[in-house]
């Protein structure tokens, strides 16, 4: 089942850099979207709250390597920036 919201369209405003970097962020964003959809039935990133992204980082990625967590963390930051919740995200990470 493919998530219905288009992550490429959602992240277009914040994606910068080389083509390979943009593709990595898009692939990871789609995996984040699928995990959140499976857990909370929310496929539209505009409906996500910070708790959903926090769960992904702290819960879903707990068994992944530090390298993977780092790169997924960069993608999560892009999503947070696109949602306009950077200030709240910084407060949650303290």
Report residues per predicted region.
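Non-catalytic DNA-binding core/recognition domains of DNA-processing enzymes
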Residues: 15-90
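Short, intrinsically disordered, charge-balanced linker/junction segments flanking boundaries
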Residues: 92-94
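Short terminal alpha-helical segments
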Residues: 1-18
